């Protein structure tokens, strides 16, 4: 059995998908689920699901399937969501506040302890019960609330400064939405999400589809 840290990143990224499906199955009181059923729910092949889970041990019985509650609890522990994860969002603009609202409503495994901004129009407000602090209070709140994950939704020019301040408070996981190349110590993991690049990549595929349709129309 491979240890948690040895699983490929592609496997790790599929685990939350499995967890979401398992959450829904538990809510529907489905006690046993097969890899074939998980395949239908996730879009991944049954073989891929079995291989992914095998990285972390044996969870089911051949011909019987997986105990849904047990598998869900194991996946929670593997990801690290069996304990509350505190999150700070830096940048309380449209993206930051939307991210906070979504997590409060849809993500029971994390707690957004605060949004941070410099605008007097929003500092002191509450977003879905999440307080908006001034950026000057970032390190104090991060330290007090034992924040483990930072979400960066500030303009690119300010993103590196935010990284440096979060790293100084021993935050080891950062989700960055700013279109900037950021640097951090080797033991800090940064996941970059550039929505503009994602949209442009999608347009490329949409263009191919449109070109194909245009060609067919000319035939």
From Swiss-Prot:
GO cellular component, one term: cytoplasm
Keywords per UniProt: Cytoplasm, DNA-binding, NAD, Repressor, Transcription, Transcription regulation
Domain of life: Bacteria
Compartments, record wording: Cytoplasm
Record's signal peptide: none
A matching Pfam family: Put_DNA-bind_N
Any one biological process term the GO annotation gives: negative regulation of DNA-templated transcription
Sections of the chain in a coiled coil: none
Principal subcellular localisation of the protein: cytoplasm
Keyword Metal-binding: no
Chain positions recorded as NAD(+) binding sites: 91-96
Presence of the UniProt keyword NAD in the record: yes
Single Gene Ontology MF annotation: DNA-binding transcription factor activity
NCBIfam families membership: PRK05472.1-3, PRK05472.2-2, PRK05472.2-3, PRK05472.2-4, PRK05472.2-5
Function according to Swiss-Prot or TrEMBL: Modulates transcription in response to changes in cellular NADH/NAD(+) redox state.
Family: Belongs to the transcriptional regulatory Rex family.
HAMAP family named in the record: Rex
Subunit structure: Homodimer.
Name used for this protein in its record: Redox-sensing transcriptional repressor Rex
Organism expressing this protein natively: Natranaerobius thermophilus (strain ATCC BAA-1301 / DSM 18059 / JW/NM-WN-LF)
Gene: rex
